[in-house]
C-alpha cells in the first residue's frame, strides 16, 4: 500500500509492505493522519527507470534495472529533476539507504520532480516495488 497524508494522493507518502503497524512511527510516519491510500499492483516483469539531471529529460541520463541505495555514488548528482519509469513500480527516497520522504512512481513520464509530489529534487535512493508475499 501507499498511504498519503492528504486527500487526492498528496502530502507525505508512506510505502507499507504486508504486515502489522500498531503505531504510525513504526512505518516512519510523521503524524497519524492518513487521508488517502492506494494499492500498488503486482508487477512480475522487468524493471527499468531512467533518471535525468535536469527537467524535461535533459542533461545526464542513467538507466537502472536494480535498486540503488546511494544515488550519488552511481549518478554523481544529489538531485534528480526528471525521470521516466519504463517498467515496474518504484519508490524514491529523499535520503540515501532508503530513508526520508518516500515517493511512489508508476510507469510514465515525470518531467519535473513536482510531478511525483516532491518539494525538492533531492533523491538519495530508490528501489523496485517487488512481490511482497
Swiss-Prot record:
A Pfam family reported for this protein in Swiss-Prot or TrEMBL: Crystall
Keywords noted in UniProt: Eye lens protein, Repeat
Superkingdom, natural source: Eukaryota
Record-linked InterPro entries: Beta/Gamma-Crystallin (IPR050252), Beta/gamma_crystallin (IPR001064), G_crystallin-like (IPR011024)
One term of GO molecular function: structural constituent of eye lens
Xref: SMART domains: XTALbg (SM00247)
Any Gene Ontology biological process: visual perception
Note on domains (UniProt): Has a two-domain beta-structure, folded into four very similar Greek key motifs.
Quaternary data: Monomer.
Protein name, per record: Gamma-crystallin 1
Amino acid at each position: 500500500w501507499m498511504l498519503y497524508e492528504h486527500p487526492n494522493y498528496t502530502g507525505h507518502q508512506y510505502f507499507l509492505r504486508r504486515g502489522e503497524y500498531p503505531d504510525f512511527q513504526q512505518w516512519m510516519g510523521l503524524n497519524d493522519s492518513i487521508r488517502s491510500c492506494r494499492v500498488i499492483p503486482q508487477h512480475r516483469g522487468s524493471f527499468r527507470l531512467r533518471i535525468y539531471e535536469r527537467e524535461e529529460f535533459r542533461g545526464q541520463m542513467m538507466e537502472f534495472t536494480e535498486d540503488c541505495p546511494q544515488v550519488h555514488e552511481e549518478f554523481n548528482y544529489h538531485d534528480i529533476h526528471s525521470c521516466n519509469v519504463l517498467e515496474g513500480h518504484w519508490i524514491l527516497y529523499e535520503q540515501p539507504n532508503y530513508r526520508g520522504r518516500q515517493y511512489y512512481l508508476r510507469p510514465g513520464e515525470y518531467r519535473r520532480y513536482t510531478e511525483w509530489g516532491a518539494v525538492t529534487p533531492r533523491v538519495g535512493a530508490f528501489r523496485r516495488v517487488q512481490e511482497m508475499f
